[in-house]
């Protein structure tokens, strides 16, 4: 099985909790937390939504792939990495994330995500007439890709708090021998 020094890569739909869970999981595991979307925003000097509107999705995916390559280099120390919801669209990203760490798919339902993000104006792919329908469409399109990349699929239960979810993920990593048991 894998050694205890691997990075943890979180994937899932936009709004599935990757950044929130990632921050708490990193603290729990004593690892740095990186959000690839924040790295991209620093690089472009603005919002992803603005970049999407100006440059288009293809240009964004090119930049995202470049950032994922950098964040998963062999010399990068172990970390918890929250990725953008569409990172799995590019086959190279799926392979890279899977080979360079342990991939955890946060498989939240579109309905649960919608409850959490319905007022969020920062998510470019959800700025449509029916965000819930768009989330369902993204789930249908991307679920097979998330599963292809994932080592673990975690389905957050409605009402389950972040601490309980982080505990569940940490326990799965420990049981698989990927992380040492918590003190």
From Swiss-Prot:
On cofactor binding, the record's note says: Binds 1 Mg(2+) ion per subunit.
| Residues annotated as binding ATP | 15-20, 123
Mind listing the UniProt keywords for this protein, alphabetically? Amino-acid biosynthesis, Aromatic amino acid biosynthesis, ATP-binding, Cytoplasm, Kinase, Magnesium, Metal-binding, Nucleotide-binding, Transferase
Organism's domain of life? Bacteria
Predominantly, its location class is cytoplasm
Residues that, per the record, bind Mg(2+): 19
Q: What does this protein do?
A: Catalyzes the specific phosphorylation of the 3-hydroxyl group of shikimic acid using ATP as a cosubstrate.
Its name, as the record gives it, is Shikimate kinase
Native source organism of the sequence? Paracidovorax citrulli (strain AAC00-1) (Acidovorax citrulli)
In the UniProt record, what gene is named as encoding this protein? aroK
